[in-house]
Curated annotation (Swiss-Prot):
Family listed: Belongs to the universal ribosomal protein uL14 family.
Source organism per UniProt: Pelagibacter ubique (strain HTCC1062)
SUPFAM superfamilies (alphabetical): Ribosomal protein L14
Gene designation: rplN
Keyword Ribosomal protein: yes
InterPro entries: Ribosomal_uL14, Ribosomal_uL14_bac-type, Ribosomal_uL14_CS, Ribosomal_uL14_sf
GO cellular component terms given for this protein: cytosolic large ribosomal subunit
Keyword Chaperone: no
GO biological process, one term: translation
Role summary: Binds to 23S rRNA. Forms part of two intersubunit bridges in the 70S ribosome.
Protein's recorded name: Large ribosomal subunit protein uL14
Length: 122
């Protein structure tokens, strides 16, 4: 569960290391985002030669959450950290590589490009 002011790690090679959620997209009263949801973020920490700079505002798709998600078969998938992948306005990933595992639920959310770049799909 990601809400405003939640800090996340970045799971791609855009150069950003740490980001902060500043808005959850999908309705004016929407409070929380989970895996596959799009959020608006501010870059809090970045590499000097990266594609994004500290303080810049972008959109991102959440790919891992500590809270975990329940599946139809009764299993629960949870991770050690909250992580997101930066995307452009069309929803395409800004980076060319993705680090760490992602979940199958991204497929039903229409994030096929992220799944194809990921090294492991749980």
């Amino acid at each position: 569960m990601i809400q405003v002011q939640t800090e996340l790690l970045v799971a791609d090679n855009t150069g950003a290391k740490r980001i902060e959620c500043i808005k959850v997209l999908g309705g004016s009263k929407r409070r929380y985002a989970s895996i596959g949801d799009t959020i608006v973020i501010a870059v809090k920490e970045a590499l000097p030669k990266g594609k994004v700079k500290k303080g810049s505002v972008h959109k991102a798709v959440v790919v891992r959450v500590k809270k975990g998600i329940h599946r139809e078969d009764g299993s629960k998938v949870r991770f050690d950290n909250n992580a997101a992948v930066l995307v452009d306005d069309k929803g395409e990933p800004v980076g060319t590589r993705i680090f760490g595992p992602v979940t199958r639920e991204l497929r039903s959310r229409g994030q096929m490009k992220i799944i194809s770049l990921a090294p492991e799909v749980l």
